[in-house]
A protein has these predicted regions:
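Surface-exposed, charge/polar-rich loops and edge strands
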Residues: 1-195
Length: 195
């Protein structure tokens, strides 16, 4: 007989949800956020690490392969996002104090790069973005990023390569394969520092 596609269970729905999810609207979770637990956020807070939260309505476009050689011709699906005044205040204050600004995932990088001003400060934003970040790209806000190990030919991998440098990211991916790291939504992640 014909095999039916597996249906998501309530347990699947719980595991594929970030702990800070509040607003309905995303088709998929911003998967890098899945690495964070309430305990980890509390430990970060105790160490004086502030967190700013934004709303991302991630779409299925993140899973489309890049099928063009000229990356400027790749069309991104639009995604809705909201960056509040409170989030801007936390991020901009950290930046002005010389602290690191760490984006959790490529969707956050896409959102913040959409909303960063020419002065390097994050601006309030409530709208849509179809920004496609690929090498070379001059980042205006974050100086570090946590990124999952994404699949080849994906826009997510291109954004990661733009942030960490293509050669260094490809070297990290080769090591990840060699050492059996997991790729994709429930896979492993890396921290990229750009000082």
């Amino acid at each position: 007989g014909e095999t039916k596609p597996a249906r998501a269970t309530s347990e699947d729905m719980e595991h594929f949800q970030t702990i800070f999810a509040k607003n309905e609207g995303a088709v998929t979770a911003p998967a890098t956020g899945l690495h964070f637990s309430r305990e980890l956020l509390k430990r970060m807070e105790i160490k004086g690490i502030e967190s700013a939260f934004i709303t991302l309505h991630c779409g299925l476009g993140n899973f489309h392969s890049i099928e063009v050689e000229d990356l400027t011709k790749h069309k991104m699906d639009s995604e809705q996002m909201t960056i509040s005044a409170e989030a801007c205040s936390i991020v901009n204050s950290a930046k002005q104090k010389g602290h690191h600004v760490c984006a959790v995932g490529t969707s956050v990088v896409k959102a913040t790069e959409t909303a960063v001003g020419t002065d390097g400060m994050l601006k309030e934003y409530d709208g849509w973005t179809n920004k496609f970040i690929f090498p070379p790209y001059d980042f205006g806000l974050s100086d570090c990023m946590i990124a999952n190990f994404y699949h080849p030919m994906s826009t997510l991998l291109m954004s990661t390569a733009a942030f960490g440098g293509y050669d260094l990211v490809m070297e990290a991916y080769q090591l990840a394969v060699k050492h059996g790291y997991k790729f994709g939504c429930f896979g492993d992640a890396m921290l990229i520092l750009n000082d």
